[in-house]
UniProtKB/Swiss-Prot annotation:
Stretches assigned to the HTH lacI-type domain: 1-57
Gene: regA
Function, as annotated: Involved in the regulation of amylase production.
Keyword Transcription: yes
Protein's name in the database: HTH-type transcriptional regulator RegA
Species of the source: Clostridium acetobutylicum (strain ATCC 824 / DSM 792 / JCM 1419 / IAM 19013 / LMG 5710 / NBRC 13948 / NRRL B-527 / VKM B-1787 / 2291 / W)
Taxonomic classification: Bacteria, Bacillati, Bacillota, Clostridia, Eubacteriales
Amino acid sequence: MAASIKDVAREARVSIATVSRVLNNVDVVNEETKKKVMEAIKKLDYRPNIVARSLKTQRTRTIGIVIPDISSQFYPEIVRGAEDVSNIYNYNVILCNTDLDISKEKDYIRVLKEKMVDGVIYMSNSLAPEILQLLRDLKIPTVLVETRESEDENAFPSVTIDNAKAAYDAVNYLIKKGNNKIAYVGVNPKLKNNARAIIYEGYKKALLDNNIPLNENLIQFGGLKAIDGTDGINVIIKKEKIDAVFCACDEIAMGAINALRENGIDVPKDVDVVGFDNIYTSSIFYPKLTTIEQPTYDMGSVGMRMLIKIINKAEPECLHYVLDYNIIERDSCK
């Protein structure tokens, strides 16, 4: 039979209340007593009844992390940052991969409600209105990472970078290198609450601010995989000669480079290419990819710290963090 809290108290020769204080890290217990209790716990192989504890405290010390695509290189570092912080504060994590499927998003939100999680870190390429409503109906602290809602006083707390400004800087970087036929391969800007969609706005503004006309023949919208970069560039180069490409993520950029190579176009001799994210393979791909670096680990850790503060009724210093980004210069630009 499994040891109970009474058994631990008897073994350590303390009260049940003292054992409870030790388990809950209450500071009033002196070190000698705490040591005796911990030795008794180890000797008896005591495991607290999590279900009973959660019913009493209305806390499970569990946080749900929802990501849109576990196969993407972008999200693991965010999850690592979030999980490292959750471990510091003794929270467990439930990881939910939605595969960019809205029905799976809905299912996981229901699962997290059933699991009585204390909070949710939510990542999604596009926050559909019904998903936002389901998250609100949870009535559980929720922080959005990588994306945010439109400006609203009731918007969920968030951690992002300024994607439009980062894109603007990337395109300006290409223009300063003498390029003026700059293609764009990315996500349809009409998608609402989509972090990648607004990258196009930065691309467009940089061109217009430099008196470069917007050429629809140089623009292709699609998904966020390498094949989308390959397909997009194959369409563009059949219509126009280009001297640069800006892509909404590194995977697209790598697919674009492959398409250029297959068509006898050298990168960077003939065409400069800039990506977005600075995923691991961007530094080992050939040529090494010039890209916008998102602080993925920090996005996860900042998001988790903010969430835990909200769970514990503390006021975060900020509800909408916009973190810094960098242009990482490598070999895909002259």
